[in-house]
């Protein structure tokens, strides 16, 4: 996985509910666990922009609900800082469902996607409407 240039704060914890910003049929997802997180005892696992997590689909089509899926965070409200000094934040926290190889399950992504995600997940970038 490619390293990110920007300073990404881990602002989302397990149990956070986020909008699913693709057309897979899931509308609201809840973070169950964070992949590749090796923490300290009793510390709540946190995730930020570009992190992959296991999520439970809470709202959506009947065939998608109550399933565990992999997802990546594509937007977060907490601002990120780029090396040139620009600070970037979004209006919502959003995720996109992915498969085991890191490719998106849907065929369309709603909303803007930051450049850091475009570098790490090129397939998500090709489907995004706007890259910021």
UniProtKB/Swiss-Prot annotation:
Any Gene Ontology CC annotation: cytosolic large ribosomal subunit
Domain of life from the UniProt record: Archaea
Keywords for the protein's UniProt record, in alphabetical order: Ribonucleoprotein, Ribosomal protein, RNA-binding, rRNA-binding
UniProt keyword annotation of Glycoprotein present: no
InterPro entries: Ribosomal_uL14 (IPR000218), Ribosomal_uL14_arc (IPR019971), Ribosomal_uL14_CS (IPR019972), Ribosomal_uL14_sf (IPR036853)
Record bears the keyword Transferase: no
GO biological process: translation
Annotated GO MF terms: large ribosomal subunit rRNA binding; structural constituent of ribosome
Pfam (any one): Ribosomal_L14
Gene3D superfamilies associated with the record: Ribosomal protein L14
Similarity comment: family membership: Belongs to the universal ribosomal protein uL14 family.
Role this protein plays: Binds to 23S rRNA. Forms part of two intersubunit bridges in the 70S ribosome.
Subunit structure: Part of the 50S ribosomal subunit. Forms a cluster with proteins L3 and L24e, part of which may contact the 16S rRNA in 2 intersubunit bridges.
NCBIfam families: PRK08571.1 (NF006344), uL14_arch (TIGR03673)
Protein name: Large ribosomal subunit protein uL14
Gene that encodes the chain: rpl14
